[in-house]
Amino acid sequence: RNGLPGPIGPAG
């Protein structure tokens, strides 16, 4: 979602 490969959302 946010473009960060973290717990918030996948990269993209």
Curated annotation (Swiss-Prot):
GO terms for cellular component: extracellular region. It is found in: Secreted, Extracellular space, Extracellular matrix. The keyword Cell membrane does not apply. Disulfide bonds: none annotated. Its main location: secreted. It comes from the Eukaryota. Signal peptide: none annotated. Keywords: Extracellular matrix, Secreted. Type I collagen is a member of group I collagen (fibrillar forming collagen). Belongs to the fibrillar collagen family. Trimers of one alpha 2(I) and two alpha 1(I) chains. This is Collagen alpha-2(I) chain homolog.
